[in-house]
């Protein structure tokens, strides 16, 4: 695997999806996760509405349980009209891109519980369409 000498800022601002290149066995320091989160919450929000909270999970059993839940929910997601499987259905120009994206997303669904950290984003309030 090629290693790039990028700062967290550079990696977050120049790197596209990397699901298939994740090193699930490499430890990640809390400070790196925190820096990523600090950068992420700089995105603008309407009416200064930062209606979010985050839970960082590093406990191996809890990560495995979250990964299992994610994997079991995957087939239900795949059936939704706006899933990666259906969003561009019939668009021949998107066939290769969709195939790469679905393969990558399926890989993440199978391996999420192995990630050294899982960040769970929570929104304040209730979404009635859930």
Model-predicted segments: where are they?
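Glycine/small-residue-rich phosphate/adenosyl-binding loop
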Residues: 56-130
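A short catalytic or substrate-binding loop motif that flags glycine-/basic-rich loops and adjacent residues
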Residues: 46-48, 111
């Amino acid at each position: 695997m090629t290693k790039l000498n990028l700062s967290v800022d550079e990696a977050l601002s120049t790197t596209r999806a990397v699901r298939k290149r994740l090193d699930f066995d490499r430890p990640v320091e809390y400070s790196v996760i925190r820096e990523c989160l600090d950068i992420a919450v700089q995105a603008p929000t309407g009416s200064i509405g930062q209606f979010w909270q985050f839970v960082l999970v590093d406990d191996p059993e809890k990560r495995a349980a979250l990964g299992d839940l994610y994997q079991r929910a995957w087939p239900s997601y795949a059936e939704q009209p706006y899933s990666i499987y259906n969003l561009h259905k019939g668009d021949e120009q998107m066939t290769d891109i969709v195939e790469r994206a679905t393969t990558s997303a399926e890989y993440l669904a199978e391996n999420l519980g192995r990630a050294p950290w899982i960040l769970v984003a929570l929104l304040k309030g209730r979404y009635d369409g859930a």
